[in-house]
C-alpha cells in the first residue's frame, strides 16, 4: 500500500494548485476595455458631468472599466436598425458607474450609483426630440475571460451576460483605467431611477415639456444638485448687475469734465 500513497498525494496537490490558480482574480480585470474600434471609452470623453451631457462617439461600441478596489464604469453606444425603413436608424447611448463584486464562482455583480446613470435615445424618423433620462440598471455577468487574442495579439476581455450570451469582445485600452471619479457625481434629495421618475431633458423641437428653469430661462440640468455645478446656477452675470444707461451717461460726464479740465 505504501507505493500508492505518494501518487495520491501528488494528484491531490496538483488538484489543489489548479483550483487555486483558477480562483477569480480581480487584478486581471483592472483597466479600461473597449470594443475593436476603440471609439467608445469610459471617462470624460463619453459623459461630461459638468454640463450633464453625453458626447456622441464617431462609431458605435462598448467600454467597461474596472479598478482593483471594486469600482466600475460602463459606456454603451448602439445603433438600432429599422428593417421596414433602413434609412431610419435610431441610436441609444448609456452611461453608468458604481461598485462591482467578483463572486467566488467567477461571476460579476455590478451595482450602479442609482442617480448618476444617463441614457440618450434618438429616433429622428419618429420624434423631433431626443430623450435624455436617468438610467439605473444593475447587471449580473455570468463569467469573464481575460487572455491574449491569438489574432490581434492584444489583451482581450470576454464578458458573458447572466444567461451566458457573450458580449462583444473588448480589448485593453488603458491601464490603469480611464474613469470619472468613483463617487456619486449627481446627488439628489430623492434617489429614484428613471423607471419611476420618468424625468426627461428637452433637446429642442415643437413640444417643450414643463421643467424647472433658472431666473434667466435656462433649463436646470439633471445634476443641478451636484457640487461641481450647483454653485453657479442662480448667480447672475456681471452684465446683468450693471445699469448700462447709467454707465453711458457716466462716460459722457467724464468726457465733458476731462475736456473742461484740459481747457483750464
UniProtKB/Swiss-Prot annotation:
The chain crosses the membrane at residues 244-264. InterPro entries: Rot1 (IPR019623). One of its GO terms (molecular function) is unfolded protein binding. This is Protein rot1. Residues 1-22 form the signal peptide. The gene is rot1. It is a single-pass type I membrane protein. It is found in: Endoplasmic reticulum membrane. Glycans are attached at residues 51, 136. The lineage of its organism: Eukaryota, Fungi, Dikarya, Ascomycota, Pezizomycotina. Residues 188-197 have a biased composition (Low complexity). It comes from Sclerotinia sclerotiorum (strain ATCC 18683 / 1980 / Ss-1) (White mold). Pfam families: Rot1. GO terms for cellular component: endoplasmic reticulum membrane.
Amino acid at each position: 500500500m505504501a507505493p500508492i500513497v505518494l501518487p495520491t498525494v501528488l494528484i491531490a496537490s496538483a488538484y489543489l494548485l489548479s483550483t487555486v490558480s483558477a480562483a477569480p482574480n480581480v487584478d486581471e480585470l483592472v483597466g479600461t476595455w473597449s470594443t475593436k474600434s476603440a471609439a467608445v471609452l469610459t471617462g470624460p470623453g463619453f459623459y461630461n458631468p459638468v454640463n450633464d451631457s453625453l458626447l456622441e462617439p464617431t462609431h458605435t461600441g462598448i467600454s467597461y472599466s474596472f479598478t482593483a478596489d471594486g469600482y466600475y464604469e460602463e459606456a454603451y453606444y448602439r445603433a438600432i436598425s429599422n428593417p421596414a425603413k433602413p434609412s431610419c436608424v435610431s441610436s441609444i447611448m448609456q452611461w453608468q458607474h458604481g461598485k462591482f463584486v467578483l463572486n467566488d464562482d467567477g461571476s460579476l455583480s455590478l451595482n450602479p450609483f442609482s442617480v448618476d446613470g444617463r441614457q440618450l435615445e434618438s429616433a429622428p424618423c419618429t420624434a423631433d426630440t431626443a430623450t435624455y433620462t436617468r438610467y439605473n440598471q444593475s447587471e449580473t455577468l455570468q463569467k469573464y475571460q481575460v487572455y491574449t487574442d491569438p489574432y490581434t495579439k492584444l489583451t482581450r476581455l470576454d464578458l458573458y451576460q447572466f444567461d451566458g450570451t457573450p458580449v462583444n469582445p473588448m480589448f485593453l485600452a488603458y491601464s490603469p483605467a480611464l474613469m470619472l471619479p468613483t463617487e456619486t457625481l449627481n446627488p439628489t434629495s430623492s434617489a429614484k431611477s428613471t423607471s419611476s421618475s420618468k424625468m426627461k431633458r428637452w433637446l429642442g423641437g415643437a413640444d417643450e415639456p414643463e421643467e424647472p428653469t433658472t431666473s434667466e430661462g435656462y433649463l436646470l440640468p439633471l445634476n443641478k444638485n451636484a457640487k461641481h455645478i450647483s454653485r453657479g446656477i442662480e448667480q447672475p452675470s456681471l452684465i446683468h448687475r450693471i445699469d448700462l444707461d447709467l454707465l453711458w451717461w457716466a462716460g459722457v460726464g467724464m468726457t465733458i469734465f476731462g475736456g473742461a479740465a484740459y481747457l483750464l
